[in-house]
From Swiss-Prot:
One of its GO terms (cellular component) is cytosol. One of its GO terms (molecular function) is argininosuccinate lyase activity. It holds the Pfam family ASL_C2. Its EC number is 4.3.2.1. The gene is argH. It comes from Caldicellulosiruptor saccharolyticus (strain ATCC 43494 / DSM 8903 / Tp8T 6331). This is Argininosuccinate lyase. InterPro entries: Arg_succ_lyase_C (IPR029419), Argininosuccinate_lyase (IPR009049), Fumarase/histidase_N (IPR024083), Fumarate_lyase_CS (IPR020557), Fumarate_lyase_fam (IPR000362), Fumarate_lyase_N (IPR022761), L-Aspartase-like (IPR008948).
Length: 462
């Protein structure tokens, strides 16, 4: 007869029901079911290889584990709080099906190293998927930039018009952020892809196991080096949570920009109806809810990172039950990041860019004032003096309700006699853009270079 709890031999009474409910993690870590089976299969194959269990029993266990996995995928495995966690659920199901032989599956293993294995397998798969989603989004941004290679818009500092830039240059800034995100996830993959199994509870095992065989079976790059550290380590999860928080911060900034640019006050872009919603009372409203949710859910990913850091901050070595709390943080952040990346990608694919409104916005706000100062520098004026002169010119324009382009040469000369007729060509928006040729700047030729560099990065990325 199968015991209710597989570890209850040392206890003389049942645990309190309220504690069972408090202790159970099955409703959360059920998400690790497939990874737990994969790990158990590799572990049992190793036990057979090392003559720790007979070969025929090993095959029976492996075949039964696959049957259990198939039944789980078909919704045939029932579970509740009494199963405690996914590891106990699978082992109890195995014993129920093949009896005494099933009890050998946990030889030379602890739930302490077992759960780390499951989490590493899960994180590895999700890490690779997130990398693909990020690459897809970078590719979409590149295409959007190419479609708007010459579109001029105001660049902003302090949410005030600053200097003219190309929309392609602006949107590629987010591609660069995502590129850094991608590289962080690749580095995180290195931390993830190590086999922890064989560390057992904390001190390793007395059985003559082969950890490298398990690593090979599960396509890990190697094994962890210290069994105490292995069962205590959640750094790879923290790295993933940080990477997701950073990624979401980037997506949230894009969302904020687009929410602003989509308003009637800006009308730089128009979001597709598929990613907006209406109001229950105001029939005219088209709200950018998808972007607002990305912005809002970003806070959850920050909270998940801080939550796990707080759980781990004062834990003594090695394993402690506190670590059970890591999964909700992890699952929630990954789910948020996956959906956010997919939604932002679709928003960009369906985005309408209002080029005329962007250009019109550049006609006000003295967006070419820096170029006027640069013009004076070319005439031999020290930049700080040029800055002061242009500040006075802008003040004059504001007082007289004029733009820089509307001033006459004579008016310019009141402030500096070195200003000539050629100033108007110098401060035209098109020339303001074209002259910015420092590497990484907003001129069309350099933006095209940025695009080509990003394309080459994606082609070479592995």
């Amino acid at each position: 007869m199968i015991q209710i709890k597989l570890w209850q031999g040392r206890f003389s009474k049942d645990t309190a029901r309220i504690f069972d409910e408090f202790n159970a993690s099955i409703m959360v870590d059920i998400n690790l079911f497939e990874y737990d089976v994969m790990g158990s299969v590799a572990h049992v194959k190793m036990l057979s290889k090392c003559d720790i269990i007979p070969e025929d029993e090993g095959k029976l266990i492996v075949n039964t584990l696959y049957e259990i996995l198939n039944d789980f995928k078909e919704g045939k495995i029932e579970f509740d709080m009494s199963d405690e966690d996914v590891h106990m659920l699978i082992e109890k199901e195995l014993i129920k099906r093949i009896g005494q032989v099933g009890k050998k599956v946990h030889t030379a293993r602890s739930r302490n190293d077992q759960v780390v294995l499951d989490e590493r397998l899960f994180c590895r798969e999700k890490n690779l998927y997130l990398q693909e989603l990020i690459k897809n989004l970078i590719d979409t941004i590149i295409k959007l930039a190419e479609e708007n290679i010459d579109t001029i818009m105001p660049g902003f500092t302090h949410l005030q018009k600053a200097q003219p830039v190309l929309f392609s240059h602006y949107i590629l800034a987010y591609a660069q952020m995502l590129k850094r995100d991608l590289l962080r996830f690749r580095q995180n993959f290195i931390s993830i892809n190590l086999n922890p199994l064989g560390s057992a509870a904390l001190a390793g095992t007395t059985f003559d196991i082969d950890r490298f065989f398990v690593a090979d079976q599960l396509e890990f790059d190697g094994v962890t080096e210290n069994s105490i550290d292995t069962v205590s380590d959640r750094d790879f999860i923290l790295e993933m949570l940080f990477n997701i928080a950073m990624l979401q911060m980037h997506l949230s900034r894009l969302a904020e920009d687009f929410i602003i640019f989509n308003t009637d006050e800006f009308r730089f872009i128009e979001l597709d109806d598929a990613f907006c919603s209406g109001s229950s009372i105001m029939p005219q409203k088209k709200n950018p809810d998808a972007l607002e949710l990305i912005r809002g859910k970003t806070g959850r990913t920050f909270g998940n990172l801080i939550g796990l850091l707080t759980v781990l901050k004062a834990l003594p070595l090695s394993y402690n039950k506190d670590m059970q709390e890591d999964k909700e943080f992890l699952f929630d952040s990954i789910d948020t990041a996956e959906k956010s990346l997919i939604i932002v990608n679709e928003i960009l694919k369906t985005l309408k860019v209002n080029k005329e409104n962007m250009l019109l916005a550049c006609k006000s706000g003295f967006i070419n004032a820096t170029d006027l100062a640069d013009y004076l520098v070319t005439k031999g004026v020290a930049f700080r003096d040029a800055h002061f002169v242009v500040g006075n010119i802008v003040k004059y324009c504001i007082e007289n309700n004029k733009s820089l382009e509307e001033l006459s040469t004579e008016e310019f000369k009141r402030f500096c006699d070195k200003i000539e007729e050629d100033v108007f060509k110098f401060i035209s928006l098109e020339n303001c853009i074209k002259r910015r040729k420092s590497y990484g700047a907003t001129s069309p030729e350099l933006v095209k270079k940025q695009i080509e560099n990003l394309k080459e990065f994606l082609r070479a990325y592995e």
